[in-house]
Amino acid sequence: MSERRLLLVHAHPDDETLTTGGTIARYAADGADVHVLTCTLGEEGEVIGDEWAHLVAGAADQLGGFRIGELTSALSSLGAGRPRFLLGAGRFRDSGMAGTASAANPRAFVNADPDAVTAAIVAVIRDVRPHVVVTYDPDGGYGHPDHIQAHRIVTAAVEAAGTERFPDAGVPWDVAKLYWTVTEASALEAGLCRIGDLPDGWRLPEPGELPSVPDGDVTTVIDVRGVLDAKRNALSAHATQVTVAPSGTEYALSNDIAQPILVEEHFVLVRGALGDRDADGREWDLFAGVGH
């Protein structure tokens, strides 16, 4: 086993790249053992353009299967190996946004039995034995029910993994550090200010339209300048969901709202102790202070 092991738990294909793609690529390039666990296939995603319109839930309902290929390509670009899905690909369905018909589907991730999915993630933790786990904050970044569910379940699983609970899920393993992936408000604003000409049809976000957290909440910053090409390639691999601008400095989802490709990714430590910090009191390494 590698001396540094990292597990990131995300709700849908593309989430891993949008918020943590640079971090995945950096640690993979540095020789860490990086695992990405995805909870659904993203069947309810809105596609870009007409090329994939026949795949969506209201048509052939084959988008989820197609997105397995996108995720496989994206993770390859990031150097993170093949995808891993919670209890297997397609076991849980994308819930869509709150109040939609898709959220009532019995297979929707939000309707999963909490103990069963907690046990499943405990089993992954005990198998991978990560020093560091990354998932979403309590709001799921932007409020998607599957992100919020992932936050709840991963938090419970990290707490349980080092105990005698779920004895059938493997040998207990204590996770040293748990982080939430977030976007720092000032970094987002600076990135937006650097955006120049936009592709036709794109627009800049209104103030507060993109999710971010106050700068003071951020405990850890990962410099991803050296792996931005890998992140851009991974974003482009999610072609049903993401368009990278010709400039290579911003991207948009199906809503055509421009978002900067930031040179740093931001995290909040919520379990474990902060390691070495800079003059601003922030870590620059997820594994800082971890005894391997």
Swiss-Prot record:
Binds 1 zinc ion per subunit. Its cofactor is Zn(2+). InterPro entries: GlcNAc_PI_deacetylase-related, LmbE-like_dom_sf, Mycothiol_biosynthesis_MshB. The keyword Transcription regulation does not apply. It holds the Pfam family PIG-L. Zn(2+) binds at H12, D15, H147. Its EC number is 3.5.1.103. It catalyses: 1D-myo-inositol 2-acetamido-2-deoxy-alpha-D-glucopyranoside + H2O = 1D-myo-inositol 2-amino-2-deoxy-alpha-D-glucopyranoside + acetate. Belongs to the MshB deacetylase family. PANTHER family: 1D-MYO-INOSITOL 2-ACETAMIDO-2-DEOXY-ALPHA-D-GLUCOPYRANOSIDE DEACETYLASE (PTHR12993:SF26), N-ACETYLGLUCOSAMINYL-PHOSPHATIDYLINOSITOL DE-N-ACETYLASE-RELATED (PTHR12993). Catalyzes the deacetylation of 1D-myo-inositol 2-acetamido-2-deoxy-alpha-D-glucopyranoside (GlcNAc-Ins) in the mycothiol biosynthesis pathway. This is 1D-myo-inositol 2-acetamido-2-deoxy-alpha-D-glucopyranoside deacetylase. It comes from Rhodococcus opacus (strain B4). The lineage of its organism: Bacteria, Bacillati, Actinomycetota, Actinomycetes, Mycobacteriales. The gene is mshB.
